[in-house]
Amino acid sequence: MPKPTKGPRLGGSSSHQKALLTNLAASLFEHGRIKTTEPKARALRPYAEKLITHAKKGTLHNRREVLKKLPDKDVVHALFAEIGPFFSDRDGGYTRIIKVEARKGDNAPMAVIELVREKTVTSEADRARRVAAASAKAAQAQEKPAQEEEVEATSDEVAYTSEPDKAAEH
């Protein structure tokens, strides 16, 4: 059974908060970024990210689940056709909240919430760097036993050469 959210609602009632989040999410998916108050942006972030996760899966069931929350079919089509496939290789973190200066009239804290459009180049570069370091360590580990065998062979040769010297001395 669904439980009501704790704490104050945005805009008053639960139904108004649901309508507010629906409209904010539709605007976010339509425009890519929106400017709103900071509490609304913080409330919108998990709501929008769950919808994007549904869009990434792309099944008919997921489309119907999103249509329950976003009644605008054009926005849902854009979400499933463009936004979902764009984030297919990203595991969460589809949105970014940037704080901006307070609103002039009532000094309300404002923020810009936007879809992250950059590919995760840094994580791919870090992953490639880690793989290269691991392969270099493996190559060094294979070279060390070969070098130790050579060292042992030279010490054996020294031992053999020193033994005949001892035999000559006796």
UniProtKB/Swiss-Prot annotation:
- Compositional bias of type Low complexity: which residue ranges? 134-144
Gene Ontology BP, a term: translation
Q: Extract the Gene3D superfamilies matched here.
A: Ribosomal protein L17
Q: Which InterPro entries match?
A: Ribosomal_bL17 (IPR000456), Ribosomal_bL17_CS (IPR047859), Ribosomal_bL17_sf (IPR036373)
Q: Which domain of life is it from?
A: Bacteria
Q: Provide the alphabetized UniProt keywords.
A: Ribonucleoprotein, Ribosomal protein
List the molecular function annotations (GO) for this entry.
Answer: structural constituent of ribosome
Q: Which residue stretches belong to region Disordered? A: 134-170
Please give the Pfam families that the UniProt record associates with this protein.
Ribosomal_L17
A GO cellular-component term linked to this record: cytosolic large ribosomal subunit
Indicate whether Ribonucleoprotein appears among the record's keywords.
Answer: yes
Can you state the subunit structure given in the record? Part of the 50S ribosomal subunit. Contacts protein L32.
The entry's family comment says: Belongs to the bacterial ribosomal protein bL17 family.
PANTHER family hit by this protein? LARGE RIBOSOMAL SUBUNIT PROTEIN BL17M, RIBOSOMAL PROTEIN L17
Identify this protein by name: Large ribosomal subunit protein bL17
Instruction: Tell me the organism.
Output: Mycobacterium leprae (strain TN)
